């Protein structure tokens, strides 16, 4: 009986201590202060297990399609590059203050750890308290698979190759916009899927 009472008392003390700590405001939520190692490891493991569990059953389509890669490149430029950077291009200034730091999507290590189904799930659903939004709110599944198709190719690109893709895409955009203006439409779009350089 004394053992049981001691156990209950211990639980009450632990709960009371946690409650007091939470409401004290002592814990520093600043993004400039990293998590304790044990906290980081627990959160990282919970994240990885959650992604693995919830991405089960997602079957990736064939991603070796130049049109998918081209569409994915434009989405990547619009929505991913600022936080994640690109080959030879650093992330934007504001992204460097994010915690945890957004991963380098061109890293071979990331592609060894994450299959395309997991990457699709992350892009679609986002990750709580990381700065990673859910693009499933604003993008179709096809749009997201297009992004995955480009990310799948990203690790093989050298900085000069990425710059060449950006340059060619900008030239196509300008040509298309000029054609639209001459035709009297007065508006253009940059999502013209002619295929990326070297993607065939």
Positions of predicted regions on the chain:
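Sparse recognition of residues in long alpha-helices and their boundaries
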Residues: 88, 135, 163-164
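Histidine- and aromatic-enriched segments that form or immediately flank copper-ligand environments
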Residues: 89-95
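A general structural signal marking secondary-structure boundaries and capping sites
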Residues: 87, 127, 155-158
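Extracytoplasmic electron-transfer domains, predominantly the class I c-type cytochrome c fold
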Residues: 97-153
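Sequence/structural segment immediately N-terminal to covalent heme-attachment motifs in c-type
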Residues: 66-89, 121, 177-182
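Periplasmic c-type cytochrome electron-transfer domains
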Residues: 2-70, 94, 114-116, 135-150, ...
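Short, flexible loop/turn segments with low-complexity composition
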Residues: 159-170
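Short, solvent-exposed mixed-charge patches
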Residues: 197-200
